Amino acid sequence: ADMGCQPHQGAGYFEVADEKNQKFYSEKYGVTHPTKVGLKIPQMFDAAIKKEIKGIWIIGEDIVQTDPNSAHVVEAMNSLELLVVQEIFMSETAKLATVVLPGTTFLEKDGTFTNTERRVQRVNRAVPPLPGTKPDGVIVTDMMQKLGFNQPDYDADQVLAEIADIVPFFKGITRERLGKLGLQWPVKEDGTDTKILHTEEFKLGKGRLKSFDWKESTEITNNQKDYPLILTTSRVLQHYNAATMTRRTNNINICLLYTSDAADDDVR
């Protein structure tokens, strides 16, 4: 989201519907910036089925596996005239693609990652890419060249410099300043970062807390005598979100039980 992948905001979280922001982006990018808010992912699925979208280019996301209602997602992808998937594995989504563009892992490219504590960290290439694969930035740059938009060769440091020029809270970030531990945005022009974002007040002001009355599920109350246990899934530390990057390792089947339930059934 920092880099503008949301349909209503550009890089730096500026609203794209604002004329002032449209002018800002147009001047920075050298092309006329879109003036309308784009579609969210679920809306894109519906639009694909309605033939309102002809093609989608997906980079590094296995939507068939991670998004709800997989059948609906598959129908949407099969409704497209062109589906381009840029991936490091032949994912469930990639299997539906018209064209697969083989990318590289984080060990095979230079750049930066930003984690959920706003920490921007350097990524240094450890090994060269496998034959036939390219870093994501190189693929995007090559595609721009093919489409007639001349670009210099992809350079991670130049991309970071462009980000720092456009995104205010990246202003003081350079590859050299990131060091081994990185910096937490917002980063001032002198390189000073921000360890704690909200110390005195929230940027957008106070919010309103909404409460909802809890109600027992009728499915449980009507069937709890015959089915006394509830099976639910959860997240674990080792698997990020839907485990698209980790589920290729051997599975370990684990079932967690409350001690009281286990004791009732003599489970030890």
Task: Give residue ranges: language-model regions.
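Short beta-alpha connecting loops at secondary-structure transitions
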Residues: P102-T104, E108, V120-P129
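Generic structural signal for well-ordered, non-membrane alpha-helical segments
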Residues: V37, I41, S70, F113, ...
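Single conserved hydrophobic/aromatic residue that forms the stacking wall/gate
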Residues: Y258-D261, D265-V267
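Short conserved micro-motifs at the rims of enzyme active sites and ligand-binding pockets
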Residues: T112-T114, P131-G132, N241-T244
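Extended, structured, electrostatic nucleic-acid-contact surfaces
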Residues: I252-L257
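Catalytic alpha/large subunits of respiratory electron-transfer oxidoreductases
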Residues: A1-K109, M143-Q151, K188-D193, L231, ...
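Long, low-complexity segments enriched in small/aliphatic residues
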Residues: L160-N251
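Long, C-terminal catalytic modules of enzymes
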Residues: G132-G182
